[in-house]
């Protein structure tokens, strides 16, 4: 049952990757079909990530009350219902509602699968890294599908494809649960919930609360860069008069992330995590500045790939480092880290959407670069952080692998 659920986790994370990039990949078609601006696209992205944040925050409560299995079933059901209604209406405002519901389902799937892996597998870091690769493959495959088969006359077909995939996955999941009915019925895996002890711990320890604040802000800014760069990349390319590569550029970005995460999985045991964050964020600054002044399509695609490669390991490494440095209440720290990332993706989308309407790509890239500079500053602060435990961060990290 455990192994089977984990294998379904691959499909669930693949789905999350698709939902994560769906709006951004369809941006050129949505702009033309509904005669909208990038500000309007920002609204969809905001509601999508608000839904994702809601799923991240509510999923632990659902798991506690109904178990991991029922929570996953509910998430799939909500997503299928949302997509079913889309068959009946292509209204702009319903697309916003659907984005929220799909985001909620994706947030619930990611949080629930992650909680299940952490609760049931000793090698949870390795298991999670494999799931993250499937997330990247999902985010990669969707823009490839759109670039190959979709035009302005059938822009809605990708949502039909998502529905078909989810329906097959849902049926397979129900069959799997029916064959393991007793185990699923008696399952009582629960996550650890924040309590007064966690609150008092951070309030009473100024150093720990400061460290937590650094990591939460880091997650906010990082997700603001990654998610919005990916979602607005087609619009960025169009603004630079490279519409012919606007869709395929998203795939180059996610190929870079996938390769980067695979490489990080191989070398993570030997990494100095704080040095890695500082190095990656510094590389990101250089690449973003260079990207701002590149107009050649080949060089732009290469730059997009390198940006994806440079940031591939930042999120999982920062999350792992946060749990190592702060030491206690790891579940609470993890939930807060992911929630802050979701919030960053939602809020910063408005800023990026506004900047793209100013008809100068330098403003948009300047915003991304400024956030990357702040990430470097936070990385320096993290680098200087010393734990009370004499065991080195690197030795502790090796024990978490």
Swiss-Prot record:
Q: What are the protein's UniProt keywords?
A: Cell membrane, Membrane, Sugar transport, Transmembrane, Transmembrane helix, Transport
Q: List the disulfide bonds.
A: none
Tell me how this protein sits in the membrane.
Answer: Multi-pass membrane protein
Q: Which GO terms describe its molecular function?
A: transmembrane transporter activity
**Membrane-spanning segments:** 11-31, 43-63, 78-98, 99-119, 132-152, 156-176, 212-232, 247-267, 278-298, 306-326, 336-356, 360-380
| Signal peptide annotation | none
Q: Outline the inducing conditions.
A: Induced by glucose. Induction depends upon the integrity of the glucose-specific PTS system.
Q: Key word Membrane present in the record?
A: yes
Q: Which GO terms describe its cellular component?
A: membrane; plasma membrane
Q: Name one Pfam family in it.
A: MFS_1
UniProt superkingdom: Bacteria
Q: Which InterPro entries match?
A: MFS, MFS_dom, MFS_trans_sf, MFS_Transporter
Localization, UniProt: Cell membrane
What does this protein do, in the record's words? Can transport glucose, mannose, 2-deoxyglucose and methyl alpha-glucoside, but not galactose.
In the record, the note on similarity to other proteins reads:
Belongs to the major facilitator superfamily.
What's the protein here called?
Glucose/mannose transporter GlcP
Source species of the chain: Bacillus subtilis (strain 168)
């Amino acid at each position: 049952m455990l192994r089977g659920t984990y294998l379904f986790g691959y499909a669930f994370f693949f789905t999350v990757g698709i939902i994560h990039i769906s709006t951004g990949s369809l941006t050129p078609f949505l702009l033309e079909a509904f005669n909208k601006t990038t500000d309007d696209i920002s609204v969809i992205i905001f509601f999508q990530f608000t839904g994702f944040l809601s799923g991240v925050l509510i999923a632990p409560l659902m798991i506690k009350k109904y178990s991991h299995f029922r929570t996953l079933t509910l998430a799939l059901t909500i997503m299928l219902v949302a997509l079913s209604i889309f068959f009946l209406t292509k209204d702009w405002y319903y697309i916003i509602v659907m984005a929220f519901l799909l985001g909620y389902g994706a947030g619930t799937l990611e949080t629930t699968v992650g909680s299940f892996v952490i609760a049931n597998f000793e090698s949870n870091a390795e298991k999670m890294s494999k799931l993250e690769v499937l997330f990247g493959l999902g985010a990669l495959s969707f823009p490839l599908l759109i670039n190959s088969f979709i035009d302005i006359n059938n822009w809605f077909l990708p949502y039909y494809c998502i529905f078909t995939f989810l329906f097959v996955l849902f049926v397979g999941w129900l069959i799997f649960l029916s064959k393991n009915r007793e185990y699923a019925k008696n399952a009582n895996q629960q996550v650890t919930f924040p309590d007064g002890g966690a609150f008092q711990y951070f309030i009473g320890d100024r150093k720990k609360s400061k460290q937590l604040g650094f990591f939460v802000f880091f997650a906010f800014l990082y997700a603001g860069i990654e998610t919005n760069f990916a979602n607005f990349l087609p619009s960025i390319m169009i603004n630079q008069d490279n519409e012919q590569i606007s869709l395929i550029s998203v795939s180059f970005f996610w190929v870079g992330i996938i390769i980067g995460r695979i490489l990080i999985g191989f070398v993570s045991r030997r990494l100095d995590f704080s040095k890695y964050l500082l190095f990656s964020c510094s590389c990101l600054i250089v690449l973003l500045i260079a990207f701002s002044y590149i107009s050649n399509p080949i060089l732009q695609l290469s730059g997009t790939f390198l940006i994806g490669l440079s940031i591939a390991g930042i999120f999982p490494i920062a999350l792992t480092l946060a749990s190592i440095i702060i030491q206690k209440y790891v579940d609470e720290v993890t939930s807060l880290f992911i929630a802050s990332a979701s919030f960053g993706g939602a809020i910063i989308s408005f800023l990026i959407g506004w900047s793209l309407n100013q008809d100068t790509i330098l403003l948009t890239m300047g915003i991304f670069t400024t956030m990357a500079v702040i990430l470097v500053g936070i990385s320096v602060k993290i680098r200087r952080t010393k734990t009370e435990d004499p065991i080195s961060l690197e030795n502790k990290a090796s024990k978490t692998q």
